[in-house]
Amino acid sequence: MKRIGILTSGGDAPGMNAAVRAVTRVAIANGLEVFGIRYGFAGLVAGDIFPLESEDVAHLINVSGTFLYSARYPEFAEEEGQLAGIEQLKKHGIDAVVVIGGDGSYHGALQLTRHGFNSIGLPGTIDNDIPYTDATIGYDTACMTAMDAIDKIRDTASSHHRVFIVNVMGRNCGDIAMRVGVACGADAIVIPERPYDVEEIANRLKQAQESGKDHGLVVVAEGVMTADQFMAELKKYGDFDVRANVLGHMQRGGTPTVSDRVLASKLGSEAVHLLLEGKGGLAVGIENGKVTSHDILDLFDESHRGDYDLLKLNADLSR
């Protein structure tokens, strides 16, 4: 193996650039040539491929987003798209690929490996919904961003004795909602993975108001319903002065935290070393503080396990 490619795919996440930096520098330090692939699998098929040197990534560790750009390209699930991508890899003499992204990106990495081009998947998504890793690249930063925003919302909520329903990202995973809800002192946290009772939440908010609390906060994961929809449901059980707020795409931005920078660096380095060992079709993650790797196929048969004890903790803290 002499030459590797790097691409970022799907939704962007803080720390992706730090991962690109790590892959590039470790690969070059081990005598490999590195090529960046712009716009994910769409750019691979289009041949948007260029050489990377250490100086090209020197400024990236603290920069959010992805300087390789990203795009969703469902056509890569089809044989025709895969063969077009393989043709571009052959044309540029690329022997292996590091793919940074979510579960859809892992499917692409697996297909490249099946076609004879070893590929390693790195978990780059704020959703933290990838099995066999305790954290994904971007998750910690997204939580910090959401916490900072909700802290500000609490300021205005207290000034007007209002209840705020706040939507956070995460698709069908409630990890951001749980972690941020506990950190922000939410009265309730609502996630897709666990049942909830709007009437019970309404009663809890009433009790808090009666005890003298000057604000209310419900954190709702986007996979449950919109903040407006939840607000409408809540109003059926009480005459609340309530507002809905959607944090949205701000959670994908912001300077990566220390945790995300270090995680991205560790996983990027491990990806290169796995490729140097001739391995492919693997997903790299962090488990109990140690860098691990699993067959990508295993991820498709497993589901992410959230820290649902946080819900009980929050229920105890909000009484």
Curated annotation (Swiss-Prot):
Its EC number is 2.7.1.11. ADP binds at R21, A22, V23, T24, R25, R154, G185, A186, D187, K213, D214, H215. One of its GO terms (cellular component) is 6-phosphofructokinase complex. Allosterically activated by ADP and other diphosphonucleosides, and allosterically inhibited by phosphoenolpyruvate. The binding affinities for these effectors are decreased however, and therefore the allosteric effect becomes apparent only at high effector concentrations. Optimum pH is 8.2. Keywords: Allosteric enzyme, ATP-binding, Cytoplasm, Glycolysis, Kinase, Magnesium, Metal-binding, Nucleotide-binding, Transferase. It catalyses: beta-D-fructose 6-phosphate + ATP = beta-D-fructose 1,6-bisphosphate + ADP + H(+). Pathway: Carbohydrate degradation; glycolysis; D-glyceraldehyde 3-phosphate and glycerone phosphate from D-glucose: step 3/4. InterPro entries: ATP_PFK, ATP_PFK_prok-type, PFKA_ATP_prok, Phosphofructokinase_CS, Phosphofructokinase_dom, PKF_sf. GO terms for biological process: canonical glycolysis; fructose 1,6-bisphosphate metabolic process; fructose 6-phosphate metabolic process. It is found in: Cytoplasm. It comes from the Bacteria. Its cofactor is Mg(2+). GO terms for molecular function: 6-phosphofructokinase activity; AMP binding; ATP binding; fructose-6-phosphate binding; identical protein binding; metal ion binding; monosaccharide binding. Mg(2+) binds at D103. The active site is at D127. Belongs to the phosphofructokinase type A (PFKA) family. ATP-dependent PFK group I subfamily. Prokaryotic clade 'B1' sub-subfamily. Catalyzes the phosphorylation of D-fructose 6-phosphate to fructose 1,6-bisphosphate by ATP, the first committing step of glycolysis. Homotetramer. This is ATP-dependent 6-phosphofructokinase.
